[in-house]
Amino acid sequence: LYNEAQLSDNPSLTESQLGFSPFVIDMFRTNEDPIMFPNVDWNDYLFKNLAWQTQHNLTLSGGGERFRYFVSLGYLLQDGMLKQLGESYDPNYQYKRFNYRSNVDIDITKSTLLKVNIGGHVGAKREPRTDELWRKVLWSTPFSSPGIVDGKLISNIYSNRYISIGERSCPLDYYYNYGYNVDTDNVLNLDLALEQKLDFITPGLSMNIKGAYNTNYNVKASRTPS
């Protein structure tokens, strides 16, 4: 089709001036040399048909006359849409989160109640270090690279002198050669409440003392292949 478009614009072009010579077309047809003349569907090569999400929750509650508790634990894993193609590390998109909550009521005395509530989460988001990947998948030609062959990434076929058109960069360069970032977020919320009944002064009178501590910090880490 590219040749036909060229001839439609300029019918006087010779075979040597066309984007794809008969030799090149025949090499694609026979798949005789898939290294020098690859034909890769990058969407199918790189992307999964689906990305799994798993979530688990555990809840416990109980206690006795003077001690009562509630504990909730949760874990979430969201996998990415990109395939793992055998490299020694995985730069795929991923999100993991562990969340927790604990509520404890303690009757210190018959008139004194202590409430301790703890909650928070730890989340880690991983993603490739470049935002060029999606654009390169759309722009790259099927013959820009054969991908990973025998465990080795063949990024660009600069020696291929037979084809000079199209985007020659390989999406795998932007997937594997730039590394990845991991962004970890840690949130902790703690609050305490002390309830003291003062019926000995006036029936129904009580005193509440409350305190809270909240913290949130973020850690960013990067890995770049050597």
Predicted regions and their residues:
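Carboxylate/His-rich catalytic cores and anion/metal-binding grooves
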Residues: 216-226
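Short, solvent-exposed loop/turn segments enriched in Ser/Thr/Gly
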Residues: 187-189
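Individual transmembrane alpha-helix segments
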Residues: 176-180
